[in-house]
Amino acid sequence: MAEAFRGEYNQKVDAKARVSIPAPFRRVIEAGDPKYSGGRASFVLVYGGDRSYVECYTMTEMDRIEERIRALPMGTPRRRYLERNMITLALNMELDEDGRIVLPPKGREKLGITPDELKGGTEATFAGTLNKFQIWKADTYAAELAAEEEVILPPGADMLSLLEETGL
C-alpha cells in the first residue's frame, strides 16, 4: 500500500515566509521522490485553479498526473486547461535541512497571506488528502471546512454513508 498524506496540522509561517512541513508529510514526500537518498527531498506545489489553497504532490504522483495530461489530445481545451493550471502554475519545491520550505510569492498570493500578516505572524493549515496535501491560510481553512460540512452531510449523519452512494 502506498504512503498517504493523512491528518491536519497548523504550522507557524515566519516573517520570511518559511513554514515547516509536518514530519509525517515529510516521510511521504521522501518516499515519493525517486531521487531522494537522504538530504533534501522534493515535491511539486501547484497554485493554479480557482481555489483558496495550494496543492502539493510527490514527484512520483506528479509524474502520474503529467502522463495522464500527455495522453490527452494536443490543443484540446481540457489539455490546455490542465497544462496551464497543473504544470505552468506549479513549482518544484525542496525541503531545507530543517524540513521547511519558503512559501513562494505566488503561493502566498493564492492563500491570501499579506506582507503585514507575515510580519505579525500567521498560520498555515496542512490538510492531508491521500495522494496529495493542501496548504491553506488557517482561518480560511476553518471557515471553508465548516461551510462544506453543512452542505455535504446533515448534522449527526455517518460520514461513511458518503461511500455507500458510490458503491465502494
UniProtKB/Swiss-Prot annotation:
Establish whether keyword Transcription is in the entry: yes
Per UniProt, the keywords (alphabetical) are: Cytoplasm, DNA-binding, Repeat, Transcription, Transcription regulation
Mind telling me which PROSITE patterns this protein's record contains?
SPOVT_ABRB
Entry superkingdom: Bacteria
All copies of the SpoVT-AbrB domain together span: 8-51, 90-140
Q: Name one GO molecular function term.
A: transcription cis-regulatory region binding
Do you know which Gene3D superfamilies this protein is assigned to? Answer: Transcriptional regulator MraZ domain
| CDD domains in UniProt | MraZ_C, MraZ_N
Q: How does it assemble?
A: Forms oligomers.
Tell me the protein family, please: Belongs to the MraZ family.
Q: What's the protein name?
A: Transcriptional regulator MraZ
